[in-house]
Amino acid sequence: METTVARKRLEEMRDELDRSISVLQGTHPGPAAGLGYPQDSADAGSSLSESDRTEAVLLAARSQRDGVLAALARLEANSYGQCVDCGHQIPAARLDARPDAARCVDCQAKHAKRHR
């Protein structure tokens, strides 16, 4: 993938993630929120469950944003498209599908297996 195209796609991804994170933070109560007395225990359980789901989505969005920022840094360092583990070129089709990919398919599979 051409670096100018990659940069544009990564910047668009970063901007979209920033918007999503902002929305999630606006709907996600902080740790001190909701400390009043719930109307009943079912309401409290429902609220906690929704809060847990929102927190999980927020963590995933932040993690994905970190990956996008790392890819932008690799662009600046002229190492974009090289696997961070083995150093081989990441196939163009993979970068088209995942512009933020840091690893080739083989190394990503090994990484995922190690971090389960």
Each model region followed by its residue ranges:
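Short functional micro-motifs and their immediate structural scaffolds
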Residues: P91, A112
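Cysteine-rich micro-motifs
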Residues: D100-K110
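Cys/His-enriched microdomains
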Residues: G81-V84, A102
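Interaction interfaces in information-processing and related assembly proteins
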Residues: M1-A77, A97, H115-R116
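Short, cysteine/histidine-rich loop/knuckle motifs that typically chelate Zn2+
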Residues: D85-C86, D106
